[in-house]
Amino acid sequence: MPISRRVLTPITAAPVILAVLCFFFWSSIIGPDNLKGTKHVLQDAKTIPLPVDGPESLEFDPQGEGPYVGVTDGRILKWRGEELGWVDFAYTSPHRDNCSSHEVVPSCGRPLGLSFERKTGDLYICDGYFGVMKVGPEGGLAELVVDEAEGRKVMFANQGDIDEEEDIFYFNDSSDTYHFRDVFYVSLSGTKVGRVIRYDMKKKEAKVIMDKLRLPNGLALSKNGSFVVTCESSTNICHRIWVKGPKSGTNEVFATLPGSPDNIRRTPTGDFWVALHCKKNLFTRAVLIHTWVGRFFMNTMKMETVIHFMNGGKPHGIVVKLSGETGEILEILEDSEGKTVKYVSEAYETKDGKLWIGSVYWPAVWVLDTSVYDSI
């Protein structure tokens, strides 16, 4: 067969066509969307540096102290104010010798979502390698709580929330096949290996309440405890899972987001802040619609390059507030140029009018007065 005919087969032509399109329309392909109604205020946030990367989740203890953050080297750190700074509080693995401040080492663990149980002071930790763990109010080495549900290992515990009245811990297992280090494989491949799990803290029983999800990332319980919201990073869709009342056991689409979601936090008034890792662009849309596009890039490029594409060529910061009842978008806050805030993983609003922001990669957290955007 002539070479000219061989190269025109669908399998061999697709990468060539894709490369040509990328060459001529590069800025249009990776450029992030411009969103209507956004407030460009995140660049005004105060930066609090850390000595290590990746404060992915933030939490405050029952006394209001903190925030506490889980970082790349497997530790949970506590903020003690400007004078004392960040201090060690807990860790998820006893193996500390080879832990890195910049790269995740599986044996060191990777604490992701953090949730304090208010009545006991115990901190529940979703670790991206070991499962769900907890540590007492004094900190130290965390103990394993859940590493299996319905006969399948918890491989990638991501974020959880506690129903204190019912003693139930809800959490995401973003993949029952892959660990945290394979997060972008799970995201780009289109595999439906994520699930939401209900853990009875008294009976010590774990039950799957939603399955076959594409990288369920954030999770939060509604203010009245009647439903759980979880968002899929691969589809930009948030699901509402009813856990009480006449709709218990059913689920529905709660919101469609303008980007790839990470963690979710309920506000003091019952709405939800959702952190977006990046906004949509043509590249992320192509990956969403055609999973072979994601697999192609994943198999031919370095992960850093893929992340660069997903972020539109530059890291930026964006968080979205959803109505706690309808899922309607109420607020969009951005640092579209990434001047201050970037790679956002969580936004946590406190009762004293502060919005704390974490990052899955950057060695910093940020804090913004809610009055800055409420007045706009």
Curated annotation (Swiss-Prot):
Range of residues in the leader sequence: 1-31
Residue ranges of coiled coil: none
Keyword Signal attributed: yes
Gene Ontology cellular component annotations, sorted alphabetically: endoplasmic reticulum; vacuole
Positions glycosylated per UniProt: N98, N172, N224
Origin: domain of life: Eukaryota
Main location: other
Localization terms from the record: Vacuole
Keywords: Glycoprotein, Signal, Vacuole
Segments passing through the bilayer: none
PANTHER family the UniProt entry points to: PROTEIN STRICTOSIDINE SYNTHASE-LIKE 8, STRICTOSIDINE SYNTHASE-RELATED
Family from the record: Belongs to the strictosidine synthase family.
Protein name: Protein STRICTOSIDINE SYNTHASE-LIKE 8
Origin species: Arabidopsis thaliana (Mouse-ear cress)
